[in-house]
């Protein structure tokens, strides 16, 4: 059964902000998650950031990171953040979004 890939509102905004060619590469990676959600690497602690339970997937020659989690009960891959790794920026943003009250 294929997974449904959903982007949080913030991740959708990240996606819209990408250049066209990068957007195509990210979209290609997101489509792969539909059939292979375990494709990305497990994240744990990144410095002071605890991203245990989340995964990362590379795009655009490893310049872009996609941070996501797998929701097995719903058969969903939820994308939390998309962005550059520079100074752990995408991981900091993902952690901030995870910790933010709904």
Where are these regions (language model features)?
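Generic secondary-structure microfeatures
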Residues: 19-22, 30, 34-37, 61, ...
């Amino acid at each position: 059964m294929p997974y449904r890939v959903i982007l949080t509102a913030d991740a959708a905004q990240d996606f819209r902000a990408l250049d066209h060619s990068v957007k195509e590469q990210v979209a290609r990676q997101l489509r792969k998650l539909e059939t292979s959600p375990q494709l990305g690497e497990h994240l744990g602690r990144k410095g002071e950031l605890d991203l245990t339970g989340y995964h990362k997937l590379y795009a655009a020659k490893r310049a872009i990171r996609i941070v996501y989690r797998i929701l097995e009960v719903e058969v969903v891959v939820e994308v939390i953040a998309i962005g550059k790794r520079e100074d752990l920026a995408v991981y900091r943003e993902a952690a901030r979004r995870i910790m933010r009250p709904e």
